[in-house]
Amino acid sequence: MNVRRTPWWHAAIALVLGLGAGAGVAVLGESSGTTLIGTPWFVPVVLGVIGVIALVLAINVHQYAATDPKKRPKTFVNPSVAFNTLVLCKAMILAGAALAGWYGGQIIPTITHIEGSFYEQAVLQCAVTAAVCLADMGIGFVGEWLC
């Protein structure tokens, strides 16, 4: 099987598309009177946990693959798990970039209303979630390299 690394510009395109979509939804929400900005606090927690799990899986695959077969412990990494870890890391690159753009895009039009308590909380939620998504994207690149 021949697997190629995800080019950096795929993540850049996903980030820009997410940025445009997030900003568009925030502007649409402001003009229509219904808001779709912000995110619950459990979202960055769940995304962070997924990132840590993916990193641990990628490290396990790398340790198994990089060790001399004669010196390997009696452990075995299932090829399906190794492949799924690689796919998870590739998905985290694109999803992390798109979601970081989405939440970052929501911040741009609403930053002018930050004096309101709702908008202040929404901007904070979006900023934290965007940072976690960027970290997930980085973990995806590292995990892909490790696999």
Question: Each PLM stretch: what is its role?
Answer:
Residues 83-96:
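Loop-to-transmembrane boundary segments
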Residues 25-30, 59-66, 105-109, 144:
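Membrane-water interface at transmembrane helix exits
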Residues 58-82:
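Membrane-helix interface/capping segments
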Residues 94-115:
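Alpha-helical transmembrane segments and their membrane-interface junctions
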Residues 2-5, 115-147:
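Alpha-helical transmembrane segments and their immediate juxtamembrane interface regions
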Residues 41-63, 137:
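Hydrophobic alpha-helical membrane-embedded segments
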Residues 2-51, 104, 116, 120, ...:
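Long, highly hydrophobic alpha-helical transmembrane signal-anchor segments
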